[in-house]
């Protein structure tokens, strides 16, 4: 299949994103960088069509509440980034769906940018078929529903992974910016962000990585109730909600998961196995080692506390 002229491709995409989708995937197979951006745009357009359910419905109602208020600055409340954007969009009479589009687009763009960077740095991924299969694994492991309908946690998770990669692998200071924005988008990401900073400044090996993961699990299961009582207010209520409340272990949300959903959840947790393998095979001096340890710690926490929306996969 011959490549279309780039300008013709752009015209075709904006005339019919759906008809151009096969071309987008073909150009991704050819490892064209621009194709990843167009796929992120396509998924952003799909998000515009999604019915407002779950958290998205509440955020939509909040948009209309803010429309009747005179807000000119930052909305100082938990998850400040989203609520400030909602307030500004309501004030300027910009459609709420644009926020949904932006969160989905930038989330996927960050994941795809991370994948493309790894692809460029590893000669073993020059094989188009292997690289494309790995990309499909990434694409289908990112939970579109979490980003589109939850907005905050899905986007915050993308910020955390992207920031951790920039900081731990590429040693770029702008990684701190993304890690700073993550808990401002969703408070639950403050622990993974702290984990990324620990991995950055503490020399880790496999055993120490396992130890930190176990300690993180014990702390999350044992002391979070005390933290929620001590902190009180909205932050305390949120911690309780995600640890022992609706979204916590044995919470109401877990009871609503069907048999097929449980099977999918447990299969998802098998993602820890390749991380363990890579931690054994890759030496600690490798720039990827710290990032792999960071990912493993997050997967370990996710596996046991069952906060199923913590990671995109």
Predicted segments with their positions:
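Transmembrane-helix motifs of polytopic, lipid-linked glycan transferases
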Residues: 102-123
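Alpha-helical transmembrane segments and terminal signal-anchor/GPI-anchor hydrophobic tails
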Residues: 52, 57-61, 66, 83, ...
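Membrane-interface helix caps and helix-loop-helix hairpins in membrane proteins
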Residues: 94-97, 142-152, 305-311
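Membrane-interface transmembrane helices that cradle and orient dolichyl/undecaprenyl
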Residues: 160-174
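Short hydrophobic/aromatic helix or loop-helix immediately within or flanking a transmembrane segment
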Residues: 57-65, 72-94
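Transmembrane signal-anchor helices characteristic of membrane glycosylation enzymes that use polyprenol
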Residues: 9-54, 215-222
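Membrane-interface alpha helices of multi-pass inner-membrane proteins
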Residues: 174-197
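Membrane-embedded helix bundles of polyisoprenyl
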Residues: 129-150, 154-161, 188
């Amino acid at each position: 299949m011959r490549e279309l002229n780039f300008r013709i491709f752009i015209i075709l995409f904006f005339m019919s994103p759906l008809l151009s989708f096969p071309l987008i995937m073909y150009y991704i197979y050819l490892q064209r960088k621009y194709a990843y951006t167009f796929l992120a745009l396509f998924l952003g357009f799909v998000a515009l069509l999604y019915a407002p359910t779950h958290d998205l419905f509440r955020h939509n109602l909040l948009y209309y509440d803010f429309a009747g208020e005179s807000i000119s600055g930052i909305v100082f409340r938990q998850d400040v980034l989203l609520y400030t954007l909602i307030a500004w969009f309501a004030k300027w009479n910009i459609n709420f769906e644009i926020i949904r589009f932006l969160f989905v687009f930038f989330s996927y763009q960050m994941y795809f940018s991370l994948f493309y960077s790894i692809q460029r740095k590893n000669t073993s991924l020059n094989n188009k078929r292997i690289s494309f299969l790995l990309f499909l694994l990434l694409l289908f492991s990112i939970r579109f529903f979490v980003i589109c309908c939850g907005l905050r946690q899905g986007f915050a998770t993308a910020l955390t992974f992207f920031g951790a990669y920039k900081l731990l692998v590429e040693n770029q200071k702008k990684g701190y910016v993304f890690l700073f924005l993550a808990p401002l988008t969703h408070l639950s990401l403050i622990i993974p962000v702290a984990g990324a900073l620990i991995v950055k400044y503490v020399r880790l090996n496999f055993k120490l990585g396992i130890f930190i993961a176990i300690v993180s699990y014990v702390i999350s299961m044992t002391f979070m109730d005390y933290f929620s009582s001590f902190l009180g207010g909205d932050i305390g209520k949120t911690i309780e909600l995600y640890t022992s409340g609706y979204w916590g272990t044995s919470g109401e949300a877990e009871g609503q998961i069907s048999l097929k959903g449980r099977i999918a959840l447990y299969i998802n947790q098998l993602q820890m196995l390749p991380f363990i393998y890579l931690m054994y095979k890759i030496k600690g001096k490798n720039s990827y080692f710290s990032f792999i340890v960071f990912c493993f710690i997050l997967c370990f926490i996710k596996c046991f506390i069952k906060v199923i929306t913590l990671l995109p996969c």
